[in-house]
Amino acid sequence: MNPGYFITGTDTHVGKTWASIALMQYFKRQAKVVVGMKPVAAGCMLSDSYEGGGQYLCNEDALLMQTHASLHQSYDLINPYAYELPVSPHIAGVDDPVDFAKILECFDALKASADIVIVEGAGGWHAPLNAQQDIGDLAKALDLPVILVVGIKLGCINHAKLTYQAIQQSGLACAGWIAVCVAGDMLNKDENIQTLKAALSAPLLGVLPHTLTADFDLLAEQLVINQ
């Protein structure tokens, strides 16, 4: 069994977090112990409820992953790099740059207590994390199969084909892709999804419907993953 999956997307705001938590719920239904990880996040909020006392920066998506895990994990393991500025991590973290060694240490700690770790990347495949490395480099360092989240909107076919090509060039396996209907008024949505099915050789794992309120159990029902 795979120790986890790396979740990337065609862009930012394409539904990676909802897809990630839907995957967590899906595997929990398979009686797996599942935890989530968002190694790098920007635009974080200051919280007064740090587990060890005092204030800390936290990310809403990472908190959702913490809440929906099979067992409680320290926030520091789930989101080791939390930046306040809502900009690219390589800019937000100029004074505290992302170090892959720290992320790998946190991942190993999570993996030791779970069957599956769902790791959500920031932004798209080539989003920079520090001066030299990007999301694709992190996926390679973790050596996890990749699941591509495609936000179904105008331009998604081009974005999906380019991202899928980059994943293939990295040498990592693409376990499949998830369509997320981010635009409620998308014209010819089904035709776009069929075009993507023909263009991407990886399997379609599910289509998540457009919704303003997340029902992660319902979203999990839309997924089928063959491990």
Model region roles, listed by residue range:
Residues 18-97, 108-109:
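N-terminal phosphate/diphosphate-binding loop that engages ATP/GTP or pyrophosphate donors
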Residues 13, 122-202, 206:
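Conserved catalytic-core segment of NTP-binding enzymes
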